[in-house]
Amino acid sequence: MSARLDDGVRPGEIVLEHASRAFSVRADRGRSLKELLIGRARAGGPPPVEALKDVSLRIEPGETVGIVGRNGAGKSSTLRVLSGIVPLNSGRVACGGQVVAQLELGAGFGRDFSGRENIFLNGALHGLVKEQIEERMAAIVEFSELDDFIDAPVATYSSGMFLRLGFAIAAHLDADVLLIDEVLAVGDEAFQRKCEARIAEQIAAGATLVLVSHDAALIERTCRRVVVLDGGRKIFDGPVGEGMPFYHRLMGTPEEVAAP
């Protein structure tokens, strides 16, 4: 997915100010209408879950930032807020320039369409005209390694093929800001290295990167800054060389075990 949330910031700049976001919890499945009405009248329903609590970040153009934390710490919620998928309850978010979010690869695919047709569809959704998509078609197909299957319906693809096509499309979009959430475990080890190399090319071209991953080694070799979230709050923001030891202590993970 790509989006534009400029709001007066420079291309590649990200601003998050006092951001808070809560989600309602629905534990209503399997209950009758009467039980729902009585339960809500008595208890008012479960309280909302606070995914982000007064989080502020400023990321300069070209920075590479990793976001780490326990499950449920607010990492994915942060990327969804930055991408414009999820609105804030309070606070401000602004991302300058073209934002490319790799959160759920292939989420917008038409399963009855071929891989090639989905490239055209997704390219158009990201603002590319037909001529621009055609110019990138060969590179996308080559990167995906789906040459023999590109004209088959994606419904016939394996999960790995599906994800490879999704990454290949996203990797060939013009990006001022890259938002990546746990999507680099795509395909075999050789393909993963190719994905990392492509991201490195985009960073070298000036793109800002915000990466969410449980892979500590990936964060350390890709990012220069790390943000640690816990319970929806920012508890560390600084150089990766200081942040990852802090994260390992938080998780109770010895650094020598976390390293590959």
Model region roles, listed by residue range:
Residues L33-A41, F120, Q132-F149, G166-A168:
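Conserved ABC ATPase "signature" region
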Residues V68-R70:
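The feature captures the beta-strand-to-loop junction immediately N-terminal to the Walker
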Residues G231-G232, Y247:
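Conserved ABC ATPase "signature" C-loop
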Residues S213-H214:
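H-loop/switch region of ABC-family ATPase nucleotide-binding domains
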Residues I219-R221:
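A short, surface-exposed alpha-helical micro-motif characterized by mixed small hydrophobic
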Residues M1-A51, V240-E255:
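Pre-NBD coupling/linker segments of ABC/ABC-like ATPases
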